[in-house]
From Swiss-Prot:
Entry's EC annotation: 2.4.2.29
Catalysed conversion reaction: 7-aminomethyl-7-carbaguanine + guanosine(34) in tRNA = 7-aminomethyl-7-carbaguanosine(34) in tRNA + guanine
Protein name: Queuine tRNA-ribosyltransferase
Source organism, top-level taxon: Bacteria
Annotated Low complexity bias: 388-400
Annotated segments matching region Disordered: 375-400
Pathway the protein acts in: tRNA modification; tRNA-queuosine biosynthesis
InterPro entries named in the record: ArchSynthase1/Queuine_TRR, TGT, TGT-like_sf, tRNA_ribo_trans-like
Cofactors required: Zn(2+)
Active site: residue positions: D93, D267
Annotated positions binding Zn(2+): C305, C307, C310, H336
PANTHER family: QUEUINE TRNA-RIBOSYLTRANSFERASE
Length: 400
């Protein structure tokens, strides 16, 4: 088996688990957050910087790499690891989320999805077999089955047809997988926000016996309470001895709540996306350092943080860089945000090892939500936007 997950300890107060993911490129402690390198690069950072942050596994995007530079070229270069000079593990998604986000540019059939490239408008067809062939060529350690990701809100009948198609596609992905001894193929469970469909999808996908399972179709606009409810329905139905991966989720509070409900792996572009607008994570919420209040603030982004940005620069300096459109400002905010999430997972793992995760979760969420509420109140009083990350970006090219 290309990847094996090892259970180390169960949390006595929740569904959380402490574990290890054994991969061809080393052991990864779980729960883990995976930085996203959509185009075979984590935006604004080089691989050594990502490694130094403590990341040991990153995600790359099949859809984007298929369109540019092409999976054949990546394979010719020796695979993703050599192409991007990354010594850790890599997970590739199947491209399903991106293709299904192209609502006006794609057509779904039982065979697969025809879509037009967001780059040049060229027409392409992605089937389960094609997606797996692309992922086999890219050479990641963990690859994801091709699934249909439904939007929110979603009609019940459509969601039901979708999970049944996803199950059929998952079986085709498994049959097409040409490198099972080198790459672990994870199945993906869906079901929108319908509890019975979440149960049905889990039953159908688990029956195919994958070495790990992605949980898809959440964090697509639904209220957080609904996401938590769906996790509580679906996660217990996934095999206890396999890793569980909540796809596209990466806000600090969602990581804590996901771990509480038994999730082992997470990914999201959020830390680098908001960094490009000067928004950073701190223990009491999100803070936008490009705001005028930080013009003469000579403290680090977060006192006590061990990241390169906080060890060397002040909020005032980083604000200056952002206002001057200097790339270093974006890099420093990205470094801090990624280190914040990697360290958060380190703290969660330490709390799980000590049997104190319930106390850690309570303290973290109380401080986080209190800080967020205070910033919203200050923003309302000032008639401003608070810590809003800036103008909305299109879903592509960077998506989740």
């Amino acid at each position: 088996m290309a990847v094996r997950w090892e259970l180390l300890r169960r949390d006595p107060a929740s569904a959380a688990r402490l574990g290890r993911l054994h991969t061809p490129r080393g052991v990864i402690e779980t729960p883990v957050f995976m930085p996203v390198g959509t185009q075979a690069t984590v935006k604004t950072l080089n691989p050594e910087e990502v490694w130094d942050l403590g990341a040991r596994i990153i995600l790359s995007n099949t859809y984007h790499l298929y369109l540019r530079p092409g999976h054949d070229l990546v394979q010719e270069a020796g695979g993703l690891h050599r192409f991007m000079n990354w010594k850790g593990a890599v997970l590739t998604d199947s491209g399903g989320f991106q293709v299904f986000s192209l609502a006006d540019l794609r057509k779904i059939t039982e065979e697969g999805v025809q879509f037009r490239s967001h780059i040049d408008g060229s027409t392409h067809f992605l089937s389960p077999e094609k997606a797996i062939a692309v992922e086999n060529a890219l050479g990641a350690d963990i690859i994801m089955a091709f699934d249909e990701c439904t939007p929110w809100p979603c009609d019940y009948d459509y969601a039901k047809r979708s999970i049944e198609r996803t199950a059929r596609w998952a079986a085709r992905c498994k049959a097409a997988h040409a490198r099972p001894d080198e790459q672990a193929l994870f199945g993906i469970v869906q079901g929108s926000t319908f509890a019975d469909l979440r149960r049905q999808s889990a039953e159908e996908i688990v029956a195919l016996d994958f070495p790990g399972y992605g949980i898809g179709g959440l964090s697509v606009g639904e209220p957080k309470e609904l996401m938590h409810e769906m996790l509580e329905v679906q996660v217990p139905l996934l095999p206890d001895d396999r890793p569980r991966y909540l796809m596209g989720v990466g806000s600090p509070e969602d990581l804590v709540e996901g771990v509480w409900r038994g999730v082992d792996m997470f990914d999201c572009v959020l830390p680098t996306r908001i960094a490009r607008h000067g928004t950073v994570f701190v223990p009491d919420g999100k803070m936008t350092v490009r705001n005028a209040e930080f013009a003469r603030d000579f403290l680090p982004i977060q006192e006590g943080c061990d990241c390169y940005a906080c060890r060397n620069f002040s909020r005032a300096y980083i604000r200056h860089l952002l206002k001057a459109d200097e790339m270093l400002g974006l890099r420093l905010c990205s470094i801090h945000n990624l280190r914040f999430l990697v360290r958060l997972m380190e703290e969660i793992r330490a709390a799980l090892a000590a049997g104190t995760f319930a106390e850690y979760r309570k303290a973290f969420l109380e401080r986080w939500h209190a800080g967020e509420a205070e910033r919203r109140e200050r923003a309302r009083a000032a008639g401003g936007a608070g810590h809003a990350p800036g103008p909305a970006e299109p879903l592509l090219p960077e998506n989740r």
